[in-house]
Amino acid sequence: ALSSAASDVYKRQALLHRIKTKSQIFYMREGFATTALCWLLISVVGAVPFVLTGCIPNPVDALFETVSGFTTTGASILPGVEDLPKGILFWRSFTHWIGGMGVLVFLLSLLPLTGGSHVNLMKAESPGPQVDKLVPKVQSTAKILYGIYFALTVVEFCFLLAGGMNVFDSMLTAFGTAGTGGFGFKNDSFASFSPYIQWVVTIFMILFGVNFNAYFLLLLRRFRRAASSEEVRAYFGIILAAVAVITVNIRSLY
């Protein structure tokens, strides 16, 4: 009887563990739903500073500006940005930086998620044709991705400082470049900066556009595998082709 009771308890515990584990898994459908809800929530919250400061008093316009920032679209309803307070300029560019890697990827790198598989959250959130788990734990993968992202941002920031930009302007430029959306703090964008600054921004926009899995492979010294990536080769091929076409198109201007 004791053996039978012990066996019954074991079976019940195994069943409860299976149910609990299954309930903690984010499937693809739940991943997309969670991503959509998080994007909606953070966009509404992100619009609040614009409205409260009076920089964008219309809530709809403020929401548009915020969504444009988080999605790194780069569209703006502002006729000019040079008169905006520094705090708003920082927040506007920071939305680009957060959105460049993805809001949920940022949260996954910070929040302790327990149990289950959260890779579908990253699949639903991250840009590009696919997202690979760089390491077994999704949270660790998110930390690696944002670690690389942060490191590239710091490197660009240092190059901009070396080119004569002040600390604040260098920070905003690095944020806008990382998101590849182009939010700036000058009405004429980068036309007012030196060729050195323009080259730095151009190079780092290209670097930030590369799949970050390739950077992880480079850190592991798997150079051949990183170079053989069809996505990376197609990416640089499209850039070179576009540069060639644009060069031919504007050659008469110079």
Q: How would you name each of these model-derived features?
A:
Residues 4-254:
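Membrane-proximal intracellular helices of multi-pass ion channels
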